[in-house]
């Protein structure tokens, strides 16, 4: 996940105070000259280095619990860019306002920090080990959940460092440090017997000194009376620059001989499973539509946010090779239990809750039961599409498990029991932060990018057809109007108009009955509008023909009050009149990802704290 300040030309990354001062000297030392750099003490924090009266001033910027950023005693801001913008207009306690950015020289990129260099590999290892994922499922999980996973692993990054020795006594540490050259500043770090404490062992003057590292009540690490740090690796990096209470600064690593093995199989943090309810009986149905994980002990405050990979519908039920042996389009009726619980109904018939019995497990399913009297042509069309849908496999679409021909034609789908997106959001403006909305829309974009890659046009993308598994996991559903394109086709022409959702349709769909992935992009823009308006109806009080005239006049729906300008800009691009000028879903997903990551990097606290961060940004 990129650093929230990475795009700023005056951000230098992980450089020392001395290096910052050297850059400011070379830039002329004018009053108000400034740059921004990573803070070595505070995870996600920065330091503002400023010149005034030919002197250097350095102000730590802490990331607050609610995801905002503030200089001690100063106002909170939703990002480092916004903070610098504020202080360029009002010094508010600084010796002067920020007048001139000390931009990086051409070709100089921000210096990556220690964790920056390890982040991608650690995220990949964590996701692979925790959820046993491989292939596309692994890649999808990394993309969608990188912000959350990074927060989990940042505090364990020290276990990847060559100076960390995970099982070493005091005597063994001394033997290691005395072996070979006894250079001043040679060091290693090891855990102590007392839980949560560590020892820093350091050579100086041919003698080994041991320093206690403990955690305070806030979880910060420090040597007694020393500077406090969020992580052990930050403490070590800082002590490489200055002794700060040590007899000598850290200089030469005493490497762990098994460091390479640790890199290959790191000790990553245990995943905090989000489910605490009793384990599900296989003969009962869950109202929330997925199978909970086994119970675990949890305190009232220990409620980490759920991740899609924690649910039973992230991977295909056929991801197990044993189950894959039985994968067929047509399902046996005796393996399908249809409950009396009706989830919905429509022109086609009804949707019922059920359970499908597989070789090794039972899964909750939603069953579309076609009403009696459905025309043969419609059944044939549905079967053709079912054959294609049966091959689709992505965590962010509702998978077709199979078709059952018995008392009626039944389509057996994955269960996503959280209801449609627009109903979930309606009236919850105060409860659901913008970052949560962006997270769900990013998942929809990932699902649509997959369909685009498979030459599959949805034709009915709308908030009503985005179903939730939980508040952090969405799936695209209702492929009733979907159509697969041939490999050489970019669009196809519908035979008849039928009952079309005109308010979600692109102009070429209405005018010429031409559908493509770019017309789905238009619908995605309308879905975005629904989501950021918290479930409001698009083109309120307008009828279909009025909407078409409205669009022909070059008009578009206004930006919803809660919608960030970056997201309305993407919406507007989705609503470009000429289909060939609209972005594809590859582009849409990348833009959604970048924006969601930028929000996720700010919002560290629980939902109520996150809303404070949103308010600070507003």
Curated annotation (Swiss-Prot):
Reaction(s) catalysed by this chain's protein: L-tyrosyl-[protein] + ATP = O-phospho-L-tyrosyl-[protein] + ADP + H(+)
Active site (record annotation): 460 (proton acceptor)
Stretch list, region Interdomain B: 255-336
Location in the cell: Cytoplasm; Cell membrane
Polar residues bias locations: 273-289
Repeat recorded as keyword: yes
Gene Ontology, cellular component aspect: cell-cell junction; cytoplasm; cytosol; immunological synapse; membrane; membrane raft; plasma membrane; T cell receptor complex
Activity modulation comment: Activated by phosphorylation at Tyr-492 in the activation loop.
Membrane topology: Peripheral membrane protein
Quaternary organization: Interacts with CD247/CD3Z; this interaction docks ZAP70 at the stimulated TCR. Interacts with NFAM1. Interacts with adapter protein SLA; this interaction negatively regulates T-cell receptor signaling. Interacts with VAV1. Interacts with CBL; this interaction promotes ubiquitination, internalization and subsequent degradation of CD247/CD3Z. Identified in a complex with CBL and UBE2L3. Interacts with SHB. Interacts with adapter protein SLA2; this interaction negatively regulates T-cell receptor signaling. Interacts with CBLB.
Role noted for this protein: Tyrosine kinase that plays an essential role in regulation of the adaptive immune response. Regulates motility, adhesion and cytokine expression of mature T-cells, as well as thymocyte development. Also contributes to the development and activation of primary B-lymphocytes. When antigen presenting cells (APC) activate T-cell receptor (TCR), a serie of phosphorylations lead to the recruitment of ZAP70 to the doubly phosphorylated TCR component CD3Z through ITAM motif at the plasma membrane.
Protein name: Tyrosine-protein kinase ZAP-70
Source organism per UniProt: Mus musculus
Organism ancestry: Eukaryota, Metazoa, Chordata, Craniata, Vertebrata
Gene (UniProt): Zap70
């Amino acid at each position: 996940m990129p650093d929230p300040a990475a795009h700023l030309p005056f951000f230098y990354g992980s450089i020392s105070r001395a290096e910052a001062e050297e850059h400011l000297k070379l830039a002329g030392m004018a009053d108000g000259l400034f740059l921004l750099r990573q803070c070595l003490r505070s995870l996600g924090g920065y330091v503002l280095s400023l010149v005034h009266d030919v002197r250097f001033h350095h102000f730590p910027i802490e990331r607050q619990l609610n995801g905002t950023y503030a200089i001690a005693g100063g106002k909170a801001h939703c990002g480092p860019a916004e903070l610098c913008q504020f202080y360029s207009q009002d010094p508010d306690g600084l010796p002067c306002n920020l007048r001139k950015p000390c931009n990086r020289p051409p070709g100089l990129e921000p210096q990556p920090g220690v964790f920056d260099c390890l982040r991608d590999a650690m995220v990949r290892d964590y996701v692979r080990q925790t959820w046993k994922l491989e292939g596309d499922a692994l890649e999808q999980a990394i993309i969608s959940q990188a912000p959350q996973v990074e927060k989990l692993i940042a505090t364990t990054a020290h276990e990847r460092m060559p100076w960390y020795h995970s099982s070493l006594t005091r005597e063994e540490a001394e033997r290691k440090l005395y072996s070979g050259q006894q250079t001043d500043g040679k060091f290693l770090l090891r855990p102590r017997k007392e839980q949560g404490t560590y020892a820093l062992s350091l050579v100086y003057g041919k003698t080994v000194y041991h320093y206690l590292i403990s955690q305070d009540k806030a979880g910060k690490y420090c040597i007694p009376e020393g500077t406090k740090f969020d992580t052990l690796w930050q403490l070590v990096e800082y002590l490489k620059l200055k002794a700060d209470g040590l007899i000598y600064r850290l200089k030469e690593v005493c490497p762990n001989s098994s460091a390479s093995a640790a890199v290959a199989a790191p000790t990553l943090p245990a995943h905090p499973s989000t489910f605490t309810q009793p384990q599900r009986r296989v003969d009962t149905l869950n109202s929330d539509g997925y199978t909970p994980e086994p119970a675990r002990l949890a305190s009232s405050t220990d409620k980490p946010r759920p991740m899609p990979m924690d649910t039973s519908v992230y991977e295909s039920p056929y991801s197990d090779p044993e189950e894959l042996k039985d994968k067929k389009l047509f399902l046996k009726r005796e393996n399908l239990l249809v409950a009396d619980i009706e989830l919905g109904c429509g022109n086609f018939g009804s949707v019922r809750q059920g359970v499908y019995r597989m070789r090794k497990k039972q899964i909750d399913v939603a069953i579309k039961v076609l009403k009696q009297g459905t025309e043969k042509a419609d059944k044939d069309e549905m079967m053709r599409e079912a054959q294609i849908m049966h091959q689709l496999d992505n965590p962010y679409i509702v998978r077709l498990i199979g078709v059952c021909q018995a008392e009626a034609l039944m389509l057996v789908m994955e269960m996503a029991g959280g209801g449609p997106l627009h109903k979930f959001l309606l009236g919850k403006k105060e409860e659901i932060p913008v970052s949560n909305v962006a997270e769900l829309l990013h998942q929809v974009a990932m699902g649509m990018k997959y369909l685009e890659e498979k030459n599959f046009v949805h034709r009915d993308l709308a908030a009503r057809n985005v179903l939730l598994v939980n508040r952090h996991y969405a799936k695209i559903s209702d492929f009733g109007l979907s159509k697969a394109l041939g490999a050489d086709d970019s669009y196809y022409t519908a035979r008849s108009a039928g009952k079309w959702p005109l308010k979600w349709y692109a102009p070429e769909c209405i005018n010429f009955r031409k559908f493509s992935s770019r017309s789905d992009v238009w619908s995605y823009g309308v879905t975005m509008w629904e989501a950021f308006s918290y479930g409001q109806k698009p083109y309120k009080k307008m009828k279909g023909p009025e909407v078409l005239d409205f669009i022909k006049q070059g008009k578009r729906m206004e930006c919803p009050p809660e919608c960030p300008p970056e997201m309305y800009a993407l919406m507007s691009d989705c609503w470009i009149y000429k289909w060939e000028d609209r972005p594809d879903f590859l582009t849409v997903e990348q833009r959604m990802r970048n924006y969601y990551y930028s929000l996720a990097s700010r919002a560290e606290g629980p939902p109520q704290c996150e809303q404070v961060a949103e308010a600070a940004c507003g």
